[in-house]
């Protein structure tokens, strides 16, 4: 059910860090309520890319995405960038009105840069603000390192796992760092 207070969490996996030369290979979304309770998980989409594009990945991405099985899923996928964008928007329309939720995640500006370059309709679905968990991580590192260090990440660098971890990390900071 649509609620303007719901939050849209997104994570992208890419072939590299430059939105002008690299592309999105996986995306996932989760919608939470304003108290960070998961309401729904959106489609987890491996986006087809050619062998030529995949061969252009640097060593880290080749090793990481090859080891997680993502590279093979991308090769086998028949979903285009446009189809992935349309599926994701269709999911989000069920939960959050356009322009209401900030884009939520970890180091979310990087994801937003790729969305702006490759999926403009999806990027424009979000409010212009960002809810970036990495901001709290940076503040905790400076003001309360024990709080930052008490959250252990075990990222697989798969989009859905990364979102779940970002939500858990924000819940951790809400409980141990943000006083209200």
From Swiss-Prot:
<protein>
    <recommendedName>
        <fullName>Oligoribonuclease</fullName>
        <ecNumber>3.1.15.-</ecNumber>
    </recommendedName>
</protein>
<dbReference type="GO" id="GO:0003676">
    <property type="term" value="F:nucleic acid binding"/>
</dbReference>
<dbReference type="GO" id="GO:0000175">
    <property type="term" value="F:3'-5'-RNA exonuclease activity"/>
</dbReference>
<dbReference type="GO" id="GO:0006259">
    <property type="term" value="P:DNA metabolic process"/>
</dbReference>
<comment type="similarity">
    <text>Belongs to the oligoribonuclease family.</text>
</comment>
<dbReference type="GO" id="GO:0005737">
    <property type="term" value="C:cytoplasm"/>
</dbReference>
<keyword id="KW-0378">Hydrolase</keyword>
<dbReference type="Pfam" id="PF00929">
    <property type="entry name" value="RNase_T"/>
</dbReference>
<keyword id="KW-0540">Nuclease</keyword>
<dbReference type="InterPro" id="IPR036397">
    <property type="entry name" value="RNaseH_sf"/>
</dbReference>
<keyword id="KW-0269">Exonuclease</keyword>
<feature type="active site">
    <location>
        <position position="128"/>
    </location>
</feature>
<dbReference type="InterPro" id="IPR012337">
    <property type="entry name" value="RNaseH-like_sf"/>
</dbReference>
<keyword id="KW-0963">Cytoplasm</keyword>
<dbReference type="InterPro" id="IPR022894">
    <property type="entry name" value="Oligoribonuclease"/>
</dbReference>
<feature type="domain" description="Exonuclease">
    <location>
        <begin position="7"/>
        <end position="170"/>
    </location>
</feature>
<comment type="function">
    <text>3'-to-5' exoribonuclease specific for small oligoribonucleotides.</text>
</comment>
<dbReference type="InterPro" id="IPR013520">
    <property type="entry name" value="Exonuclease_RNaseT/DNA_pol3"/>
</dbReference>
């Amino acid at each position: 059910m649509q609620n303007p207070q719901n939050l849209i969490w997104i994570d992208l996996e890419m072939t590299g860090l430059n939105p002008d030369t690299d592309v999105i290979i996986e995306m996932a979304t989760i919608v939470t309520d304003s108290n960070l309770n998961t309401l729904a998980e959106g489609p987890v989409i491996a986006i087809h890319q050619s062998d030529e594009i995949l061969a252009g990945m640097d060593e880290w991405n080749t090793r990481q995405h090859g080891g997680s099985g993502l590279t093979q899923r991308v090769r086998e996928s028949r979903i285009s960038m446009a189809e992935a964008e349309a599926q994701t928007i269709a999911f989000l329309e069920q939960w959050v009105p356009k322009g209401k939720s900030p884009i939520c995640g970890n180091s979310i500006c990087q994801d937003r840069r790729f969305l702006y370059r490759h999926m403009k309709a999806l990027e424009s679905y979000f409010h212009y603000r960002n809810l970036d968990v990495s901001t709290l991580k940076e503040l905790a590192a400076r003001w309360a390192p024990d709080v930052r260090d008490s959250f252990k990440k075990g990222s697989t660098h798969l989009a859905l796992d990364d979102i779940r971890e970002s939500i858990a990390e924000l819940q951790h900071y809400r409980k141990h760092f943000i006083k209200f």
